[in-house]
Amino acid sequence: MIVALQMCSGLYADANIEQLNLQLQQLPATRPLLVCLPESFLVFSKSGQQTLAIAKQSDVYIQQLSDLCRQYDIWLAAGTVPIATAHDKYFAASLLVNNQGDVVAQYNKMHLFDVDVADGTGAYRESNFTQAGNDIVVVDSPFGKIGLTVCYDLRFSGLFSALQRAGAEIILVPSAFTTVTGAAHWQPLLTARAIETQSYVIAAAQVGQHENGRATYGHSIIISPWGDVLSELANGIGFIGCQPDLNRLHAIRRDMPVQSHQRFREHLL
């Protein structure tokens, strides 16, 4: 089973870990269980400097996440954890941790949110403190082959196509969409990516008014390879879940083999 937690993370990592612990106590007893967390679940700061300070001690928090995985016998897709680089910046790293507490995959967010939005924040400049990643990540798991993305990556269909070609059956999209962009684009983009890649899309989201002054859209959602909404949580803290049917996924890919029909390649331009 896979579940997506919807969270309203705050300024302080310790408090956010405690919120996570409380939410984990409410989850079903089904095992194996993959728990997907939203972007910035560990710290949703007012400044890149505050996040950078957390990034420089990320090992401490990753150890706490590993301990939770062992305690609850779960796999954890840790939305984003800031991990310091050598350039006084940090990666927005999506980590996959198994039920033994081992980090089995790390994806560093590739596309950074340098955008102007008509909301209370106005200007977002993620690249001021975040270093972009370069590599796609697909990893085997008891739940299927998992492809990792983060939030703004959702707008770049080529990344999702690359994940599908690399074998992804389930694509995770931990996010902290603004209320403005979320209302306009969130579900249409997620549905399109699920249909295009014929994959399950699991999108755990931040929700509500945060201590840093930001407001996020929520609407955590799970979408099937056919584009059906399997579960959604519009507002509030909580969780949604599904049991992916990989036989159904492969039947869809067999009956409509769009990848084998694909003739367009960017390198031909």
Feature locations, PLM:
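CN hydrolase (nitrilase-like) catalytic-core segments centered on the catalytic cysteine
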Residues: 57-77, 145, 154-240
